[in-house]
């Protein structure tokens, strides 16, 4: 992910577009390099779909964590500028994801940009939250976990109240949701 993002920015510049991302994927990696949302998006590119349609057309994984995994580089190249990191992450994520799938990448990129100039973990997390919609499920869930932590809940208690009780993977939710 880091190498691909680096090549993208070197070739298309910091103002790259989602279409630049899709073209880089097609030019630089094989179709077998991807899984879940990214594999569907790649197939959609090959079938002529451009972003953002490439993200949602027949893509049941469109809100999973694949884009979140790609967010690191945009945080690294924007130290102290979480807004720029999140904006670049949005453009990258929008080719393969929608809603919380996009917000995850924005959240990670913003936190890494902030972490370059700040060591306060709560401030870093709140910075990440400030870059995603307050109405999103990701914002709600990360806020719950943060509040549980600040209230002194143990890791196990936090898992139980914030994850297992809310998202039972036996009840229609995959853990990647």
Place the predicted regions along the sequence by residue.
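Structured, active/binding-site neighborhoods that engage oxygen-rich ligands
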Residues: 1-177
């Amino acid at each position: 992910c880091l190498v691909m993002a680096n090549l993208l920015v070197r070739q298309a510049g910091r103002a790259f577009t989602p279409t630049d991302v899709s073209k880089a994927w097609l030019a630089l990696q094989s179709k077998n390099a991807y899984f879940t949302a990214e594999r569907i998006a790649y197939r959609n590119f090959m079938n002529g779909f451009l972003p953002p349609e490439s993200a949602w057309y027949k893509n049941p994984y469109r809100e999973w964590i694949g884009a979140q995994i790609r967010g690191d580089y945009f945080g690294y190249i924007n130290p102290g500028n979480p807004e720029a990191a999140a904006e670049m992450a949005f453009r990258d994520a929008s080719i393969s994801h929608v809603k919380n799938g996009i917000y995850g990448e924005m959240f990670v990129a913003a936190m890494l940009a902030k972490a370059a100039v700040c060591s306060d973990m709560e401030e870093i997390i709140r910075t990440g939250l400030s870059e995603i919609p307050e109405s999103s499920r990701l914002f709600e869930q990360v806020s719950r976990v943060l509040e549980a932590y600040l209230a002194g809940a143990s890791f196990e208690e936090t898992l139980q109240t914030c994850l297992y009780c809310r998202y039972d993977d036996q009840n229609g939710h995959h853990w990647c949701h």
